[in-house]
Regions:
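Metal-dependent de-N-acetylase/amidase catalytic core
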Residues: 1-138
């Protein structure tokens, strides 16, 4: 997919356990994070990996500029999401099989995002998502 879409940025969950926020360390989420990082480097940029993609489908190797890792225990970049908080909660609530039982969902998420905003130096009352940003150009 990376060779088809040719993104400059890939956003994925962290493959690492985050002991401060156990919920973001779900095994499925960590597996997706690991697979995404493996796809970005080395596979997508390597002309010798999956040569059939190049030869049969015309998909040239692609070098993703950066990866933003969500839920990382080593977050270094903070994005103000205050204006979209309601949409985030609505999207999470649509995932009923996983979230339907969480009566405290909005409060819990607001707490995480408030702490992230404070860590990122945002003004009081703001909410932020936290990411570890990897430069993948090297």
């Amino acid at each position: 997919m990376i060779r088809q879409v040719c993104p400059d940025r890939v956003v994925c969950p962290s493959p690492e356990r985050n002991y401060a926020r156990a919920g973001v360390s779900h095994p499925d989420h960590r597996a997706v994070g690991s697979a995404a990082l493996d796809a970005v480097y080395p596979d997508a940029r390597n002309p010798f990996a999956f040569p059939e993609l190049r030869d049969q489908e015309g998909l040239a190797p692609w070098k993703v500029r950066e990866v933003w890792i969500a839920g990382s225990p080593s977050a270094t970049h903070f994005v103000d999401v205050t204006a979209t908080f309601g949409r985030k909660i609505a999207a999470l609530r649509a995932h009923e099989s996983q979230i339907g039982h969480a009566d405290d969902l909005e409060e819990r998420i607001r707490g995480w995002l408030t702490r992230a905003a404070a860590l990122g130096g945002l003004p009081e009352g703001r909410l932020a998502e936290a990411f570890q940003v990897l430069d993948t150009q090297g």
